[in-house]
Structure formats: C-alpha cells, structure tokens
Swiss-Prot record:
It holds the Pfam family HD. The keyword Hydrolase applies. Residues 447-563 form the HD domain. It comes from Aromatoleum aromaticum (strain DSM 19018 / LMG 30748 / EbN1). Modifies, by uridylylation and deuridylylation, the PII regulatory proteins (GlnB and homologs), in response to the nitrogen status of the cell that GlnD senses through the glutamine level. Under low glutamine levels, catalyzes the conversion of the PII proteins and UTP to PII-UMP and PPi, while under higher glutamine levels, GlnD hydrolyzes PII-UMP to PII and UMP (deuridylylation). Thus, controls uridylylation state and activity of the PII proteins, and plays an important role in the regulation of nitrogen assimilation and metabolism. One of its GO terms (molecular function) is phosphoric diester hydrolase activity. Uridylyltransferase (UTase) activity is inhibited by glutamine, while glutamine activates uridylyl-removing (UR) activity. This is Bifunctional uridylyltransferase/uridylyl-removing enzyme. Belongs to the GlnD family. Residues 686-765, 794-862 form the ACT domain. It catalyses: [protein-PII]-L-tyrosine + UTP = [protein-PII]-uridylyl-L-tyrosine + diphosphate; [protein-PII]-uridylyl-L-tyrosine + H2O = [protein-PII]-L-tyrosine + UMP + H(+). Its cofactor is Mg(2+). The gene is glnD.
Length: 862
C-alpha cells in the first residue's frame, strides 16, 4: 500500500470543524428549499451530493492512500439519501489492511462520525468483497449500485468486473422473491396495518426498490420508463409508479424531518402532523390523518398489484423457455406456464362474467398457481364493468356463491378479489370499508383487512393441518352443515362499520339483501342475518357477565335459541376476536368462551340451569380429583361445609380440587394461606388467598399485584360461612413464562408476609399511558345498575388500560362500604371494559350511586 504523510491531529480537527459547519449549513438549506418547493430530488439528490462533498474534504484531509478506493453502496450508492438515513460505505483495499492502514481508516471513519454522519461501513479486499457477496444476498444487493467516491479507479473497475461475473440473475431473482415473502410475513402479509412501515411493509418503498434491483441485475432497465419501453409495464403504469414513488418518498422525508431520526413507522403520534405537512386537509366525515392514511393505502395497494405483475414479467425474461402449447380451459381461459390466462385481450369486455369466473377456476384447478400478468392487469382495468346490471345477473350471483362454496382457495381468492377491486364492485357496501381505519385501540387492521383475517380464521377451522391449533373449532365446523354460510356471516359482520349507529344492526340490512338476491333458503338467510346482528353478543356475555349465574346462561340461551345458532356464533366469535390483533386473544378468553358454549349447549339440550352449569358434576369431579391425588374420602367435608352454592358455581372442578387440597386440613387457618400456580390456560398465574375476612382486603390484594406489574384478568371474591375470605385471581405477567417459578415463590412468600402484618395497601404507580391512548383518548364511562334479581348491582366501566386501575376502583368501592363479589376484566388492546358484581347499603339510593360514579370517574381520568 502507498504511504502518504499522516496529517497532524490539529489539521484533521480543523477539517472536521469546517466540514461539520458546511454539512449543518447545507442540510438546513436543503430543508428550507424543500419546504419552499417540495420536490423529492431536492432532498434525496441534494443530501447525497452534500455528503459526497463532505467525504471528499475529509478523505483529502486524512491523506488517504491513493491505492485505496472508497465506494458508496446501497441507497447512497444510488445517489439518494433521506434526511436521517445511514451513509453506507465500503473501503476497497488492494491488500489486507495492516496496522498503519487500520489507523488511517480509524481516523477517517472517526472524522465522518464527528461531523454528524451515521456511517455504515466495511473494509475489504476485492476477493473479500466478492466472497461476502456470494455468501449473503443482502451484501450482494448493497453492492449492486456501488459507485466510486474517491481513490483507486482501476481497483474499483476490477471489483465491478468480478461482481458482474459473480452475479447470477436467476439466483438473485429467486433470493429477492424469497426475501420479500419473509418480509411480507413479518408484516402479516398486508399493507393495511393501522401503523404501517412506509419502507418495509408490503406496498412500501422496499417493494419499489426491489423491482429496481432485479431490473438492474437483469439488465432490463434503470427506471420505470425503461421497463415501459421493454413492455414489461404499460406507460400508464410507469407514470403511476413514479407518482406513487414520489408520494412514498415525500412521506418518508417528512417523517424523518418530523422525528429527527430514521423513523419509518407511520405511528398514530405522527399521522395527523404528517397529513398537515403534506397539505392534506380534513373532510366533513374524516380527520386529516384518516384522509392521509387512506391515500397511503390506495398507493400501497397499487404497489403490491404492480409488484405482482412485474415480478411475473421479470420471471418470463429471466427464465426464458419455449412457450408450450396453451392448455384450453374453456372459451374464455387457458393455462399458460401454470398460470390462468385469458384467451383474448378483450375477454372481460366480451364476457363480463369472466371477472368472477376466473377466481372460481383458480379454486377448482389446483395446478394453477395464479394469473398471468396480462390477466391481472385486465382484471384491474375492467373492474368497473361490475355495475348494477352485472350484480343483478343470475349467472354472476351463482358464480359468487360457488366461490364461497369451494373446498379450497377461498381466502386466497377473496384477498385477490379485494386487491383488484372486484369485491368492491360486487358488494357496493364493501367500498366504504376498504382502507377504513379503526381507532378503537384493539383492532390493528383496517376494516376490510380485519374481515379478511376473520375469514382466514374461519377457513382454518376446516383445515386438517390446523386442527391441532383449534381442535374444538375443527370438530364443530366439520359437523356444521353448509359451513360456507359462516363465510357469508364473516364477510358481513363488520361491513357497516363507520356509517354511524350500531354497525351490527345496520349490517343486517346488507346481509339480508345479499341473501335474498342470492336465493339463500329462508333458514340459511335467517342464520346469516342473526349472526351479523349478534356477532358481539357471546363475547360480551363471556367477558362481562357472571356466567356462573343460571339467569345469565338462561338469558343467553334464550337469545341463541338453537344449538345450530350457538355453534355458529361460537365459531364466528372465536374467529372475530383472533382477527382483531395478535395481542387481543389469549387462552383465558378462549376458556371463558368455551365454558359459556358448553353450559349453554347443555341448557339447550334440556338440562336444568343447575345441570347446565354442571354444579353436581363439578362437585363429583372435584371429589374424583381429590381421590386421584391420594386424599381419602371425606377429608374435604369440613371445608365444603363452609362453602355455599355460589362458590361451587363460580369455580371449575379443577379449581375446587386445588383449593381443597390446599385447605382441607386447615379450614380454620390462623394465618393467611397464599398459593399460586401457572394457569391451565398457560396464560399467566392463578392465585388463591385464604384468610380471615378483613376491611380493605381486596384493595390490599389489587395494590400488591399492581405494584408487581401484573394485569388482573379475573377476580372472584368469596366469603365463607365462618367469616373467611377465599379469593381467586387470574393474573397476566408482563414478563414471560420462563420465570414463573420465581414469580410464584415471590407471590406466595411476600403476599403472605404482608397479610400477616396487616400492612397498609401498596399504592401501585399509575403507569404511563400508551402513545395510542394519548393520540386516541378514551373517555371513561361508569354506570351502576341493579341486576335482574334485584339482590346485586352491576358496575360497568370503560377506560384506558393502565397499571393500578383495578386498585383505584377497589379503593373507591371500599371507601364507600361497597362489597365486591366478582370482577370480570376484559382488556381489548389499550382499552379495558370491566364489570363488577356489587352489594352494599345505599346502592338503592340514587344520590349515593351518583356520588360513587363521580368518584370513580375522577380516579379514571388521567
């Protein structure tokens, strides 16, 4: 390596100071120019040029050897830099770096960091660079657009020759396809998340970049116009892509400026300000952020459409093979290279019904892997042929029902129909929910994508490969005659979202109209409409009402009416909750629904309310479990004599046996007994507390759990006949299951000691509100109403979830002398909807109730 005089530290520091000032001044000028006249090139090209100049100065100031080459790689190599993007560099060495060279590189890289650049770098010989590219597709991609910044041009040209020799376009194409599939999977295969990543999510900038990389690697072109000239896309598609690319670039530029960092997620916190920065205004019906996000979704959808078409066309270019004879399917379609192809360019114009028929053919012919690019393009361009006359055509109605009735491909084809605008054409109500955001803080998808997730879940219940995940669901749906009706209910259950009013009621109008137009039998139509109207009922009863109360089960059974309706509603409810967000479903909710399902089914099959709840069976099964654990008959009698029927109704046989094993020999325990275990739902920890009843006990228990950071999923408060509290809690640990043994030990020891000492209640910290709640605040609601028996009162509250919330409620109730019997905690993402069964003097007095409600609201407001 050549040796040049190493500059003095003072000279380097002076160069750094000057470069830092120039970079800051240049960055400010670029931003001002962009704000004055927003053009993406002002930032992307301008910042890349500014960084080029900075690097040139520092390279010279550090007197780097002439035989070394400095390359810009990645996006910077392409000559584009977003405001806060990393600057990716590769130092190309003629030989392995010695100590002197390492020292010079350290000075240069240190200088680049000191001026304020975020540097990503590597230092390699040509052989090392080629080897790294062979081993890692990410490195290979990064080097695809490399350009020489400084230094040894012959060395750079040697690297370019060897890189081109290495590049196998076929391998590169397949690797990038696989990479995209994995990336899509990380984002649940949808661009319609409520907080998408504008760079990495499906339909984001990365999709466009990937199309560019493959085109460049295959020599197909360097921009969208080149691809249009090669007829890989149309001129209109090229213009659309450039327009969409600019939109996404504007979004990312604004996001970087707004956050001051390389942030690519469109978080709720930023959406309103981004809309303002982009000049997007609110409408009478939608806030500016919603208008902005719908525009984002429309553009992301177009990107994914064109991505599919272009990748297919790339494949034809990269893997040329003799076109085999097309296999004729019917007058309208043929199979070409395992893809469905229209036989004539005007197929959809001459045969509009083919707009639905093509999806049915894909379902019926498993050898077909998709549609040809020209068919997909024509599908999109002809989507508006689906009009009132099309929808009224009996043949088209038969085709749509046939698609729903197929044994395979239902989810794939409905997603494709949604992607290409066919579903919006055929179901006019669907248009209103495409890209519609949901600000309820537990749905993480737009309305149309949530429905697709529910449809997917329902479909999975029927598939053998998923039976181990949902064994009961699989058993029920396979015994359910005409289960395609459940798919219809799934399609319509949320179709009236966002119209104002009760979407469950409004949706029945659309569902009834669909059923009548498609000639569903009266019984089937009634089932679909009933499911749409009641799709929230089972979730409400299971999570908010006392399902150990025979009256609650009786009312729910009256609402359901038949076992067929019950089964259908159970399947839809399960699929619906799982389709809201990966975080909303848990095993505890599954158990609540399952218990309600079986109790109601027994009642519908003729059991008495007591038999339906399994009270006698529960005691018998609990005794059997005690015998199984080696306890002799009758040891439980002393304890059970102190427990009333309410206790046995509210606990499962397994819980009763667990309590009994722990307490049978000490029903008059002098000291508190605390036992904990991992729940059988594998979702947290069950805790049992047995101690002499005392004032503020529930407040102390909730304070203790709140201080440890546990969420209380369920609480059952019981007082025995001899004055002991036997309280049960289901807790969700904010950590993970790996340390449950330590958690159980901590709870049993520390809580026992605190109860022994009659220590004052722990005051859990209020906890911080999530950013979602800050952006979409939840107005607390509280109501206290008598139950139907007139013996108890039901407190219902809705509020933003936070640590210590249940403690605050318990404290207000205790201060007012109110006795709490059960607590049902329904956590829906960032929102809680809790229900408490109460009793106490004064609850029959309106003034007293108003006072308690006011105090609760004061504690719930943050």
């Amino acid at each position: 390596m050549s040796t040049a005089a190493i500059p003095t530290d003072a000279a380097v520091q002076a160069a750094i100071a000057e470069a830092r000032a120039r970079l800051a001044d240049g960055s400010m000028r670029i931003r001002m120019a962009y704000e004055g006249h927003p053009a993406t090139s002002t930032v992307l090209k301008g910042r890349a040029h500014l960084v080029d100049e900075t690097i040139h100065r520092l390279w010279r100031a550090c007197a780097m050897p002439a035989d070394v080459a400095l390359l810009a790689v990645g996006g910077y190599g392409r000559g584009e830099l977003f405001p806060c993007s990393d600057v990716d560099l590769m130092v190309l060495l003629p030989d392995t770096a010695d100590d002197a060279m390492q020292a010079r590189l350290s000075v240069l890289l240190g200088a680049l960091w000191d001026v304020g650049l975020e540097i990503g770098h590597s230092a390699r010989t040509v052989a090392e660079a080629i080897d790294a590219a062979e081993q890692d597709i990410t490195v290979q991609t990064n080097l695809l657009e490399s350009r020489l910044l400084e230094g040894n041009r012959p060395l750079f040209e040697e690297f370019c020759r060897r890189y081109r020799a290495l590049l196998d376009v076929r391998v590169f194409f397949k690797a990038k396809q696989l990479e995209q599939e994995k990336r899509y999977a990380r984002y649940n295969d949808t661009p319609y998340a409520l907080e998408p990543n504008c760079k990495e999510s499906p339909g984001g900038l990365r999709d466009l970049q990937m199309l560019g990389w493959i085109a460049r690697a295959a020599g197909l072109g360097r921009n969208w116009r080149d691809l249009a000239r090669r007829r890989l896309i149309t001129g209109a598609e090229a213009r659309d892509l450039r327009s969409i690319e600019r939109f996404l670039q504007h979004v990312r530029i604004r996001l970087h400026y707004l956050t001051g960092r390389s942030e690519d997620r469109l978080l709720f916190d930023y959406q309103e300000r981004l809309a303002s920065a982009l000049g997007i205004e609110a409408t009478a019906a939608k806030r500016a952020s919603e208008v902005f996000m719908q525009r984002y979704y429309v553009n992301a959808k177009k990107v994914t459409q064109t991505n599919t078409i272009l990748l297919q066309n790339y494949g034809v270019e990269i893997f040329p093979r003799r076109a085999g004879a097309a296999i004729v399917i019917n007058e309208r379609f043929q199979a070409v290279r395992e893809l469905l192809d229209m036989r004539e360019d005007d197929t959809f114009a001459r045969h509009p019904s083919a707009l639905l028929e093509c999806f049915l053919i894909l379902q019926q012919r498993s050898e077909l892997k998709g549609m040809t690019a020209r068919t997909l393009r024509a599908l999109w361009l002809n989507r508006k042929r689906i009009n009132a006359a099309f929808r009224a055509d009996p043949h088209n109605r038969e085709l749509f029902v046939a698609i729903l009735q197929q044994k395979r491909g239902i989810v794939h084809e409905f997603r494709r129909m949604n992607q290409y605008g066919i579903l919006s054409g055929y179901l006019p109500s669907w248009r209103r929910i495409v890209g519609q955001m949901q600000h309820d803080l537990f749905h993480v998808y737009t309305v149309d994508q949530h429905i697709m997730m529910v449809l997917r879940n329902m479909r999975r219940f029927t598939m053998g490969e998923h039976a181990h995940e949902y064994p009961l669901m699989a058993q029920l749906i396979m015994a359910f005659d005409r289960h395609w009706l459940l798919y219809v209910a799934a399609l319509f259950h949320d179709i009236a979202k966002g119209r104002g009013g009760d979407h469950s009621k409004l949706g029945t109008i659309d569902a009834r109209e669909f059923c009548e137009h498609h000639h569903l039998a009266r019984e089937d139509a009634d089932l679909v409409v009933w499911l749409v109207e009641h799709h929230l009922t089972m979730s409400h009863v299971a999570q908010k009402e006392d399902t150990s109360d025979p009256a609650v089960i009786g009312r729910f059974a009256d609402t359901v009416g038949t076992e067929r309706r019950l089964t259908a509603l159970y399947l839809l409810t399960h699929a619906d909750i799982r389709g809201t967000s990966p975080k909303v479903w848990n095993g505890w909710k599954g158990k609540l629904l399952e218990d309600l399902f079986f109790a109601t089914r027994r009642l519908l099959r003729g059991a008495t309310p007591q038999e339906a709840l399994g009270l006698d069976d529960r005691q018998e099964n609990a005794r059997a479990l005690l015998r199984y654990h080696g306890l002799r008959p009758g040891v439980e009698d002393a304890l059970w004599a102190q427990l009333d029927a309410v206790y046995f109704m509210r606990h499962s046989a397994e819980e009763i046996a667990w309590h009994s094993r722990t307490l049978y020999y000490r029903p008059d325990a002098l000291e508190p007994v605390v036992k904990a275990r991992v729940s059988d739902a594998d979702q947290g920890v069950q805790v049992m507390v047995f101690t002499r009843d005392q004032k503020d006990l529930f407040v102390r228990l909730t304070g203790f759990f709140g201080r440890l950071g546990f969420s209380i999923l369920d609480a059952k408060v019981h007082t025995t006949r001899h004055g002991y509290a036997l309280d049960s809690f289901m807790l969700q640990d904010p950590g993970n299951a790996e340390h449950y043994r330590d958690v159980i030990t901590l709870i049993e020891h520390e809580l026992t000691e605190r109860l022994k000492k009659s220590a004052p209640p722990d005051r859990p910290s209020a906890g911080r509100l999530s950013r979602q709640v800050k952006h979409f605040p939840i107005t607390p609601r509280v109501s206290i109403l008598p139950d139907e028996s007139g013996r108890h009162y039901i407190l219902s509250l809705t509020a933003a979830d936070r640590r210590g919330l249940l403690f605050a409620v318990a404290e207000v109730l205790a201060q007012n002398g109110i006795v709490l019997h059960t607590a049902k905690i329904a956590t829906l993402g960032e929102r809680v909807e809790d229900t408490f069964l109460l009793s106490g003097n004064g609850l029959s007095q309106d003034a007293r109730v108003v006072k308690i409600e006011r105090e609760l609201l004061q504690r719930l407001h943050i």
